[in-house]
């Protein structure tokens, strides 16, 4: 048995524990998550609906790679999405009051990388295949799973906005999940032990 001893400070935290931004990023990099792209419509108001793949000339699909989301409730089906206050996606989600969640599979690494930057000039959504839900939300074809969400509440916390959304439509796709760990993308190494 190994015992670890820490010397406490006034706040009760071990002296070896720091609270610097870089340190907390390192901690969170060890938390393995799935990878999703959050999709919204930019422009409008006329969008494709009912599975059509045609957008009005005044609209385009906007995406943001995310792993800061989680299930909140199963009945009703609610989820939580955290978006930085300076992100373009934040404004688009607030404006449209809905968004799509596309869980990516291992064959969609390029999609994850494409939408992982906050610089919209680097997004290449035109070459990707999309389909649209009955409610007009864009979804990335070939994803592992899809959720069409309607925002029911949102609030600002520090440098992020927390969106609580109801999953109004959802569908399973196929493939193996793309995973994010230590600031990199990978797949699962499934072993039959």
For the regions a language model picked out, list residue spans one by one:
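Basic, polyanion-binding surface patches
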Residues: 2-193
């Amino acid at each position: 048995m190994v015992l670890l001893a820490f010397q406490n400070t006034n706040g009760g935290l071990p002296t070896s524990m720091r609270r610097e931004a870089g340190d907390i990023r390192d901690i969170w990099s060890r938390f393995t998550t799935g990878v999703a792209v959050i999709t919204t419509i930019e422009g409008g108001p006329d969008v494709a609906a009912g599975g059509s793949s045609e957008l009005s000339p005044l609209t385009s699909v906007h995406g943001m790679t995310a792993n800061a989301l989680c299930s909140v409730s199963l009945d009703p089906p609610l989820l939580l999405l955290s978006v930085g206050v300076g992100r373009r996606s934040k404004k688009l989600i607030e404006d449209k009051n809905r968004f799509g969640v596309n869980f990516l599979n291992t064959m969609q690494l390029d999609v994850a990388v494409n939408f992982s930057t906050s610089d919209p000039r680097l997004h290449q959504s035109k070459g990707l295949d999309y389909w649209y839900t009955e409610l007009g939300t864009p979804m990335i074809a070939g994803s592992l799973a899809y959720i069409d969400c309607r925002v029911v509440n949102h609030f600002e916390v520090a440098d992020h906005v927390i969106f609580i959304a109801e999953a109004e439509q959802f569908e399973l796709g196929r493939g193996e999940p793309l995973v994010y760990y230590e600031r990199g993308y990978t797949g699962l190494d499934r072993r039959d032990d």
